[in-house]
Amino acid sequence: VGNMPPEFIYYCFSILKPFEQGVEKYIKFLNNIDNEKYVDSFLKIEKWLDETPPIPGELFRQWIKGIYQDNLLIQNKMYVGNKHVSLKNLNMPVFTQVAVGDHLVSPECSMPLHYAVSSTDKILKLYPTGHVGMIASSFSQKTVLPELGQWLKERS
């Protein structure tokens, strides 16, 4: 199948909200051009999007079909290779970070994963950001990642 180029992946996700991704984000950028914090966060996100590596085509196909369309993971029907993936078997510490504004992995989709794992050492945190903002924004650098780092440190 080959690789899925990052431009195609970005296109697939951007058509979920075409006006927001194609026009509105640039209008917001121009309206906030004097806000250094906003511009810094915007540029970090754009850089992250621009540096997305290609994804193996078969992996992309299985991910879209199995996770998005058929919801196999939460239904306890997912396999990786020949191995069954059961969330009930996950008994290690789990830190579930949910982006409230995520249009790719909505809170309604990510929160059930948190409750499906059998771990007794788990935490669920909601953040007022979007999908990419969880990793590639000023908010992420100042809040999301430090909280995750502290949580990991406490368990190492």
Task: Give the predicted meaning of each segment.
Residues 67-86:
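Active-site nucleophile elbow and catalytic-triad environment of alpha/beta-hydrolase enzymes
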Residues 1-58:
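Alpha/beta-hydrolase-fold enzymes
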Residues 90, 96-98, 102:
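Short beta-strand/loop motif that positions the catalytic acidic residue
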Residues 147-155:
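C-terminal alpha-helix
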Residues 87-91, 116-119:
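Short, conserved loop/helix-junction motifs that constitute active-site signature segments
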